[in-house]
Amino acid sequence: MKAVVYDSAKNFTVREIPTPEPKEGEVLIKIELAGICGTDLHIHEGNFLAEFPLIPGHEMVGIISSVGKGVTDFKSGDRVTVNPVVSCGDCEFCREGSPILCHNRKGLGTNWPGSFAEYMIATQDLVFKVGNLTPEQAVFAEPAACAMHGIETLGMKPGSSALVFGAGPTGQILAQLIAKSGASHVTVAASTKFKLDVAKNLGADAIYVMDRSNVKKSFEDLKAMRPEGYDYVIEATGNMAIAEICVPLTRSGGTMMVYGVGETTDTFPINAFDVFHREITIKGSFAEIDTFPSTIAALQSGRIKTDGLISHRFKLEEYGKALETLRSDKTAHKVVITF
């Protein structure tokens, strides 16, 4: 089979390798679509827990080609997606019922072979049928599951206001889920107008076009739009200059959530007294672990919409071009690999 194989950070080729055979409890999946996201850019650089050699890719949909011994819930021909996060089940956090915080967490496409290949192996406990979802819908299962975990972490109260920084695919899905969780008003702020137009079409109450070279003005404008602040402010860009203005934009008693993926060394300043006397809560939301069933149900019901999110399609052999498009093309939204 053909696969993207990294021998080290930044050093990859698309080459022929043996097609794996499913072992007991495993399924072999023929990939139909695989999504590229910002995490893959970090992995390309050797960050985000990447271990080489590696086949990257953690967003996918495909058809089961064959199953190993002991697999009873799946058969050849089933369209499925895969939860790429694997917890050990034995560390302190797993035993406490918090596997998302697992000390020994593994990830398909991070330190296990992922989906930028014609075929991939997954253990049956990580595999989910997608029913009547199209490949173009089902490929969003993983980013949507991350957004679903973010909503659970946020713990939103109905009637609240929210500000989402970032209109990438997960920012778009977060905004939808926030609105459907009973928010009275959702504002999405981003630097790309066409992405904000998509956000508006998908249900955002207000949009704001940011100038990332003048974050101070963006802060002033967003503060003027809601002088008392926003009950929930979600940073979904990974940009530390934007993260810095989140707490000041949070309403007293409100919550700021760090959701965007930055570099492992990134920091941003916080006024401790402001957090203290206004009783601001700061939360983080990382990946997902158990939200695939609810996410697939939300995609099937139309509660999560993905219309207009896929902007670019590339063949596996064009993986390098796909990465560069996501990194530098301002018209890129969701970039997918087709097979």
Residue spans for each PLM region:
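Short amphipathic alpha-helix with an adjacent loop that forms part of the alpha/beta core around
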Residues: 215-227
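N-terminal glycine-rich cofactor-binding segment
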Residues: 3-21, 38-66, 81-82, 99-113
